Amino acid sequence: NNIKESLNKNDGQLQNRVISATYPPGSVFKIAVLFAALENKVITNSTYYYNCTGSDQINDKEKLNCNNLAGHGIQTLGEVFANSCNPAFYDIAKKVGKDEIYKAIKTLHLDQKVDLGLDEEVNSNIPNEISLSNLSIGQGSLGITPIQINQMTQIIANNGLYKPLYIYDSIINSDMKQIKELTTSKEEELISPYTSTQIKQFMIGVAKTGTAKLLNDIDGGCGVKTGTAQSSVNNKEVTHGWITGFYPVENPKYAITVLIEGTEENSKSAIPMFKEICENIKPW
């Protein structure tokens, strides 16, 4: 019952993980890779195909496995995204190049705090030395906060328009005097409407026929990207489950991100939680 003692504990039980903890984003980061590829026109929806055999060779000693070890076969770009095919995204990353993916990270504000106005917010960890194979699927030493992922989704849902997120304008004391004013960034178009519309359609496909097809009966529809990410906690390998998306499909009103820590496989808990949120906030 000692609040101060609980707040100072190192186990993070009372830590606001949405803004002050970073996690490998896993496959939700494929949104950024896809954006880089489409915006730079290295692939197109109508011309890109990939034959997934279940893995792709990285070098003489390493290979990148797909979540479907039997292989997905020949896929369109929409199917690649819906199936979250790792070898295909490695292929896309090789076409677009690491430099352009890092530029996409910057464009989508994944390299800076969201700056809600809370002091405990931390920034992402995006080292330069991440291998292209890990970068293509959001693994390795990448660390991004859930609120940063949610802001990326918000930008996509807003047709490429960045709108600053904040929870207050100013703070006043008991004498009604302003003691702090929050300064926010200006609205800015970061992604062309054409590219953002394509990504939104791919995300809708994930909810209809892809890794989140359990969401295909949501009233109003949604667009999402799921992900699982491996990391180490207290020298123990754990898997986190992600889902980020927008709701409803027409004139989206909400960007929603769910992260389940440590016990996930194939986002099995994150997907129904996302669905429950949508069902309880639907605006009709």
Residue ranges and their predicted role:
Residues 1-26, 32-260, 266:
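Beta-lactam-recognizing serine transpeptidase/beta-lactamase-like catalytic domain environment
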Residues 148, 270-273:
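Hydrophobic alpha-helical membrane-association signature
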Residues 178-183, 272-284:
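Short, gly/Ser/Thr-rich active-site loops of penicillin-recognizing serine hydrolases
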